[in-house]
Swiss-Prot record:
GO MF assignments: protein kinase binding
SMART domains according to UniProt: WH1 (SM00461)
PROSITE patterns, per database record: KBD, SPR, WH1
Compartments, as annotated in UniProt: Cell membrane
Subunit composition and interactions: Interacts with palmitoyltransferase ZDHHC17/HIP14; the interaction leads to palmitoylation of SPRED3.
Positions bearing Asymmetric dimethylarginine: 240
Gene name per UniProt: SPRED3
Descriptive protein name: Sprouty-related, EVH1 domain-containing protein 3
Membrane topology: Peripheral membrane protein
Segments traversing the membrane: none
Cellular component annotations (GO), alphabetically ordered: plasma membrane
GO biological process entries: negative regulation of epithelial to mesenchymal transition; negative regulation of ERK1 and ERK2 cascade; negative regulation of lens fiber cell differentiation; negative regulation of transforming growth factor beta receptor signaling pathway
Free-text function comment from the UniProt entry: Tyrosine kinase substrate that inhibits growth-factor-mediated activation of MAP kinase. Inhibits fibroblast growth factor (FGF)-induced retinal lens fiber differentiation, probably by inhibiting FGF-mediated phosphorylation of ERK1/2. Inhibits TGFB-induced epithelial-to-mesenchymal transition in lens epithelial cells.
Amino acid sequence: MVRVRAVVMARDDSSGGWLPVGGGGLSQVSVCRVRGARPEGGARQGHYVIHGERLRDQKTTLECTLKPGLVYNKVNPIFHHWSLGDCKFGLTFQSPAEADEFQKSLLAALAALGRGSLTPSSSSSSSSPSQDTAETPCPLTSHVDSDSSSSHSRQETPPSAAAAPIITMESASGFGPTTPPQRRRSSAQSYPPLLPFTGIPEPSEPLAGAGGLGWGGRGYEDYRRSGPPAPLALSTCVVRFAKTGALRGAALGPPAALPAPLTEAAPPAPPARPPPGPGPSSAPAKASPEAEEAARCVHCRALFRRRADGRGGRCAEAPDPGRLLVRRLSCLWCAESLLYHCLSDAEGDFSDPCACEPGHPRPAARWAALAALSLAVPCLCCYAPLRACHWVAARCGCAGCGGRHEEAAR
């Protein structure tokens, strides 16, 4: 039915988490249908299994027979786990698309079992001992323990609905499974509406998956594919009130008595502005900074006020041709190489050659090394005046000096 690549996980109650089975590694996990022997005068029987085989050594890492009553949990878009009795398995997928494909195939198999089209091995009383051994739902008992310390509480499946799978969505903050939309609507319909308001229609179809159970809320793909933020433009809200006499012929009947302040005559409308004369037209008003639209910078991904030329204020991540020219003319790369090879920490980090902030472990050795290097490379002494000229040019708005925010392409 489906074949994906994922890492098979097992529950570890000692640490309260999930551990990879057999030291980890990608496995090829598939949901397949296994056909059994054909009884005399009957149809061919079979069952569905989840089979996992590690790619590097072809070792079986997962073998689980599907039965009604399975509890399926979707923790996040790429990690799903399920439990069947005392057996608990989990899969870490490579992408949300593969996780959704596996979930749909698993729910389709459980729906087929619930309809009774296939008879599971647990309900047949005439199966041989060899078939019982081959259809054991939890052969990996050494890697799976009972989930007694689970932080997410679940409800037992009633006997009348044992054929339908239980699907829950968990979050990192510890909230329980979401309520299906069918139950929310049934509870809302039990109370009569207070006002005959029909401005907000209900959705035509509930969000439900295979098996008749689903969940609401915003999905993972909705956040990844969300559009750009709305422009921060100011708008004026104008509310107009109709006269009381206009409601006389309405179908709702005569209007109710209004208070005295509301029944007074409306104030006269302001006089209309005269048309512009033949004289010179006035200059257009300058747009205020609040009316400028907000855009996202392509370099630092921050929001900024977009101007007419599509650029904004200063951006530390934007390319600065003037500063790059100053570094090349003053040979600043020589000082950075000296600090990296001689005065860097265990992780290879070093401070800026011209930084004067306190806290350096060896300030005397640092400045002595830079002074000795300036004797061999005299152009290092030109960095301070060139840097000052670049700062003044950036303040004055000269072209090529100072990086600016640029709008990302839509």
